[in-house]
Amino acid sequence: NAISDFMSPDRVVVGVESARAEKLMSKLYKPFLLNNFRVIFMDIPSAEMTKYAANSMLATRISFMNDIANLCEIVGADVNMVRSGIGSDTRIGRKFLYPGIGYGGSCFPKDVKALIKTAEQNGYSMRVLSAVEEVNEQQKSVLFEKLKKQFNGDLQGKTVALWGLAFKPETDDMREAPALVLIDKLLEAGCRVRAYDPAAVQECKRRIGEKIYYACDMYDAVLDADVLMLVTEWKEFRLPSWAVIKKTMAQQIVLDGRNIYDKKEMEELGFVYHCIGK
């Protein structure tokens, strides 16, 4: 989305060090001003801080919701209902309130770390962001912990299908991807891993080699699998043929890391189903 984001930005933040620089940059960004896009001028340190703080705020919302989701499971609440309830508050809004298995990519992890490091270098502690980072790292293992619980800790020889490798849909980017943490833990526990991703297979091979089986499609991934883990919410995973999958799997267990399936429907189809936060 780089081109569309550039041509239709939510806002443009420009750091300048003088009135002359602001005048020159205003001329450069004149097409954006004519289209009524927000162009905000400020001093350079504030512009730099704005960029890091914006991504860190979004990362904070994600980790907060993941923490709430984990508590919902403990006390018997439904995180989807909680999300709807708090998202309807106009002071909060609905964006970035979806629980899952942690954020990844090149922006959120990097910018959170950058603010924490900048604070340390200046004798200050970013306690909230340190907690955000800690929660996110723990959340990347939540599906593995559910798997251990399902099999009472004995995972040796289990075949696990992964749907999704990239950190988000519509990309092959695996930087800081939860799938990498999950694969490491599964292999260490003695599991066989069968993975499919519409775009990130080659990138995964580049990173970890042939340690796992790379399926040609989502149905190949679940062949003789004991468990299916939904890792990345690609559109093609939303409406699979569950009848085919049920016949193909060795055991009918689904761990949904993105909450894209309906628990009641999955159980009526005969699957053992676990998701995040309910």
Predicted regions and their residues:
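Structural/interface elements that position substrates and couple domains in central-metabolism enzymes
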Residues: 1-278
